[in-house]
Every structure is written in structure tokens, then in C-alpha cells.
Amino acid sequence: MAEEQDLSEVELSPVGSEEPRCLSPGSAPSLGPDGGGGGSGLRASPGPGELGKVKKEQQDGEADDDKFPVCIREAVSQVLSGYDWTLVPMPVRVNGASKSKPHVKRPMNAFMVWAQAARRKLADQYPHLHNAELSKTLGKLWRLLNESDKRPFIEEAERLRMQHKKDHPDYKYQPRRRKNGKAAQGEAECPGGEAEQGGTAAIQAHYKSAHLDHRHPGEGSPMSDGNPEHPSGQSHGPPTPPTTPKTELQSGKADPKRDGRSMGEGGKPHIDFGNVDIGEISHEVMSNMETFDVAELDQYLPPNGHPGHVSSYSAAGYGLGSALAVASGHSAWISKPPGVALPTVSPPGVDAKAQVKTETAGPQGPPHYTDQPSTSQIAYTSLSLPHYGSAFPSISRPQFDYSDHQPSGPYYGHSGQASGLYSAFSYMGPSQRPLYTAISDPSPSGPQSHSPTHWEQPVYTTLSRP
């Protein structure tokens, strides 16, 4: 048994490479008469992948000495006697546990009892079988056994369990590495997610500061000083070049939280206008919308319309594409003075209570401005966030010629309610389709701090879906 322990240790020691060299010459003569023994002797010489199988077979062979020829055993003894075992840290190398106390293995269950006994027998009968193939075969055979065939192994496993309990009364199974690996992996994933969120927040903060910087040229632009020449006002330069990712840009600009909306992650916002009656939203437009940061611009859009930013209208239009800027915000943003050449004039009966209106998204074509005030009209008030004035890209088309920009006009308009006065959020998608979300304010008559006071509101009417 001492020699068996030495054999297992020499497999794990640096001298293990010497042992195969000694085994190979000695095992060569035994190939002829004893194919099984010679085969097992030769299997010690291949690479370390076979060491586990060779060690098992050598340990099994020590029980019956006739498995290995005399020359093999003499060669092994010669190698082991010449090696200084104090050079090898045995506890660490053999069981991998802490040096203080050796690792106690769990008692074998019934299948392990069966597999260990059957593996020895099969390895003796079929020495050429690979260990993995043996394991597969043993598993299949075990599943085919009935209860009566399994009973002896179950009884032996129970006996081993009781013996193990006697030998190690305070034994507690403590799986070591697998659990820690999973925990470490989970910890690695969590900081990754936090880092991703942190990166997104940093990008959004960057865009927010960029918009604050762009606000100052925007304050001098015609959008805020009442100059009707909006193309020159927009030539102050769009805040972002076309190559800028739209997700961060829009997340830094749009604040859907004010309407109680929750935006979806995948660019398809789940819009829940709490008290707003929405028409059917065009799926194409919604799919083209990028993700928004819900909490980013709440400071710019106070719920009750603080006079510092928006005195009487708690809304702001953020233009994110040349087309939509023309479509929506231009009449609202740029043409503030009453004398602006708008295709429409505000309806005679604009209700001061500002019923929130929506327009149905009409796939049949771009919405058109109509001159006669009707119930599906929406009076857009001037958007009074001058620091977003420069957010509009320069427009090269006539001011309200946006029919070619919008294949499907997703204006939210309802034909069943009185026309309401509210400013529009224009969230521009990548394909430059404006999406109007309306915010109503019950006091739309007060003066505005950063923009001219009440100018005549342009009235937009759109065709509803047939």
C-alpha cells in the first residue's frame, strides 16, 4: 500500500516524467506475452492527459501484482527510491486543500460504488478503452439496472456513509471552488452593468452640458428674439453632427417623464399619457424613435411651469432632425412674432383651459395645415426654452414645406375635443419624423421669461387615419 501511495505521488511530482522513461524500456519486452500488461505499461508514456487513467490502473494493478511484469515494478522501485519526496509539497499537490487540514472526500453514493468497481473490471478487460468512453458506458448501464440489481450498491453506499460518519463526526460538505467561481462571475457581471449605466450617465451628462453651451448662441438666434428668419437662426449650427449617436443625443434632450410616459429600452417607447387621449401611434415612427433618458431634463421642464424657464407653458420642443424641426417646432419655435407667414391662424375660440389634444397618426400621407379652424386643430404655443434654439439643425427648405419629409405624420390630434393650446415636444427620430407629445397647462396666458409674450398661435390640423 505504501508503494501504491508512492505511485500516485510520483504521477503528480516532477519526476513523473522520469518514470515513463524507465517504464517504457522495461515494458517493451512484456508487449508480446502480456498484451494487457504491456499496454498499461506503455500508457504511462503518453502525455499528462492520460495520467489520471494510468494512475488508477496502476493503483488497481498493485492489488494484483501479476498485472505489471517484474521489470516494471523494479523500475518503479528504483525511481521512487532515488527521489527526495521532501521537495514536493504533498498536501497542496495531492488534495489541493489547505495545508493545515487535509481534504476529506464525501462518501460515495450507490452509482459511485458501482462505477468504481465496474471501471476496474472493464479497464482490465478492455485496456484500450478511453476513460471517457468507460464513463459513458457505466452511466448507461446504471440507468438500465433495475432496483434489485442496484440494491447491493445502494447497501454498500449506505455502509460507507455510516462509516464516514463515524470517522468524521463533524464533517460538513463544503463545496469550494465552483460556488466561489459563480459568485465571482456574478460580481464581475454586476460591476459591468453598473459601469455600463455609469457610462451612459456620463454620456448623457456630456450631452447635457453641450446643450447648455449651445443655449447661449441660441438665445441670440431669431428663435428667441422674435426674428422670423428662422433659417438663419438655425444656421447657428446643429448641436451634433450626423455621425453623433442619436440615442445619447435624444436621451439628453427629451423628457418623457413629464407626461408619465415610460420609454422602452429598444427604441419603442411605451407611451402612457396619463390624462391625454392619444390617437393611434404610427408603429413605424415609434420604432424609429431612439431611447430617452427619463430623468434627464426634468430640471428644464418643471411640472408647474416655473417662470425661470417656462413661465406659462410647461413644455419645450426639442428638435432632433431637420425634417421634424420644420414639421413641428418651426412654427412653434422659430416663427414667434405674430406677423410670421404661417399657413394658418389660431382659431377664434381657443380655450384657455387648454384641453390636451392628440392627432391620429395617419399613414395615408403627411398632415396638412388647414386654414379653417376645426375641432381637430391644435394650437401650438411658442416654446420658450431658448437654450435649445441651437438644437435645431439648419433647414434648407421653406419654412413649412415638410410634406416630403414626413411619409407618415404622427401628429396626435383628436377630432372629438375642443382645440387645445399646448406646446409640442418634437422628438425627432432617425428618419426625421416628428413625434408630438402634448402637454397642457391650465394657465396659458401668462408672459414668458425667455421668449416674447403671446404671439398668435399657429393652428395645425392633420388628416386622421381613415
From Swiss-Prot:
Q: Which Pfam families match?
A: HMG_box (PF00505), Sox_N (PF12444)
Motif mapping: Nuclear export signal: 134-145
Q: Which residues bind DNA?
A: 104-172
Cited Gene3D superfamilies: High mobility group box domain
Which tissues express it?
Answer: Expressed in fetal brain and in adult brain, heart, small intestine and colon.
Give me the ranges of the annotated region Disordered.
Answer: 1-67, 160-199, 212-274, 354-375, 433-466
> Is Cytoplasm one of the keywords?
yes
Membrane topology of the entry: Peripheral membrane protein
Provide the residue span(s) of the region labelled Transactivation domain (TAC): 353-466
Domain text: The transactivation domains TAM and TAC (for transactivation domain in the middle and at the C-terminus, respectively) are required to contact transcriptional coactivators and basal transcriptional machinery components and thereby induce gene transactivation.
* Protein name, entry field: Transcription factor SOX-10
**What species is this protein from?**
Homo sapiens (Human)
Q: What gene name is given for the protein in this entry? A: SOX10
